[in-house]
Amino acid sequence: MTTVHSIADPCDPEVSPTNNRHLTVSYASRYPDYTRIPALTMKGQWLEAAGFATGTEVDVRVMNGCIVLTAQQPQPEESELMQSLRQACKLSARKQKQVQAFISVMAGSK
């Protein structure tokens, strides 16, 4: 007879079978020699529901017999001031000192 500690607890799978998709590897031909290149095509509203809206950048990890797609979070938009400072970093040392002096004057005049 088994003890309480040796009975496996039921668990839910990480991915529901209703969320699984079945794809077939097709091919795309490459000009000029029309070489067949393996290709996967994915489309459907389920992509957006899964976090892959149009324009989403995707990280692709490839392993033997396995491809993992991960939607990347959009980077927050950089402020106009930060963009200007990034451009100022590309200026000559003399011009950078002028920018620093200007910022010091502006910061001091509250």
Curated annotation (Swiss-Prot):
An MF annotation (GO) of this entry: RNA endonuclease activity
Pfam families: SymE_toxin
Residue intervals of the SpoVT-AbrB domain: 29-74
Keywords recorded for this protein, A-Z: Cytoplasm, DNA-binding, Endonuclease, Hydrolase, Nuclease, RNA-binding
One GO biological process term: RNA metabolic process
Its EC number(s): 3.1.-.-
Subcellular location, record wording: Cytoplasm
Gene Ontology annotations for the cellular component aspect, listed alphabetically: cytoplasm
Chief location category: cytoplasm
InterPro entries: SpoVT-AbrB_dom, Toxin_SymE-like, TypeI_TA_SymE
Function: Involved in the degradation and recycling of damaged RNA. It is itself a target for degradation by the ATP-dependent protease Lon.
Family from the record: Belongs to the SymE family.
Protein name (database record): Endoribonuclease SymE
Organism: Salmonella typhi
